Amino acid sequence: MSRVGKKSITLPDKVTVKVNGSSVQVEGPKGKLSWTLPEGITATVEGNQLSVDRAGESRQLRALHGTNRSLLNNMVIGVSEGFVKNLEIVGVGFRAAVKGNILDLNLGKSHPINQVIPEGLKVTVTENTKVTVEGIDKQVVGQFAAEVRAYYPPEPYKGKGVRFVGEVIRRKEGKSVGK
């Protein structure tokens, strides 16, 4: 049995889960998410516990068991608390601003970068260099934050670029001058 898959998910008070065949809908104070379970994986709600079971012992079903349990757990956390990713922009003249549903980034390139903010995400910029991404879907929040970071990953010599708050950048020494 999958160690992750056999753990049941405790549902907070304000979260409701509806299982309709292979479709699972999770609703909470922050919003609503739905997920379709693959064939052979079932979910059941008993009281305030959500459990995920599998039909057989095939290698693929064992792999999907823990994965789908984790995805459902992330949905429950998302609709009750939400997910947050914090990014910081380091560099002279590097800045960010939100204009409608577009995140405008100036990262020292010859042109500004306009990243469309996906529906369901709330992006805020403070001090022109601190970007906060909030949402109920963990995958969408992480994907958007990773895309923003990928425009200018932190470089090891001066540390310029877009990084996650708390991310440690291995620094390198520059070239040493000869005699």
UniProtKB/Swiss-Prot annotation:
It holds the Pfam family Ribosomal_L6. GO terms for cellular component: cytosolic large ribosomal subunit. GO terms for biological process: cytoplasmic translation. InterPro entries: Ribosomal_uL6-like, Ribosomal_uL6-like_a/b-dom_sf, Ribosomal_uL6_a/b-dom, Ribosomal_uL6_bac-type, Ribosomal_uL6_CS. It comes from the Bacteria. GO terms for molecular function: rRNA binding; structural constituent of ribosome. Keywords: Ribonucleoprotein, Ribosomal protein, RNA-binding, rRNA-binding. Part of the 50S ribosomal subunit. This protein binds to the 23S rRNA, and is important in its secondary structure. It is located near the subunit interface in the base of the L7/L12 stalk, and near the tRNA binding site of the peptidyltransferase center. Belongs to the universal ribosomal protein uL6 family. NCBIfam families: L6_bact. This is Large ribosomal subunit protein uL6. It comes from Akkermansia muciniphila (strain ATCC BAA-835 / DSM 22959 / JCM 33894 / BCRC 81048 / CCUG 64013 / CIP 107961 / Muc). The gene is rplF.
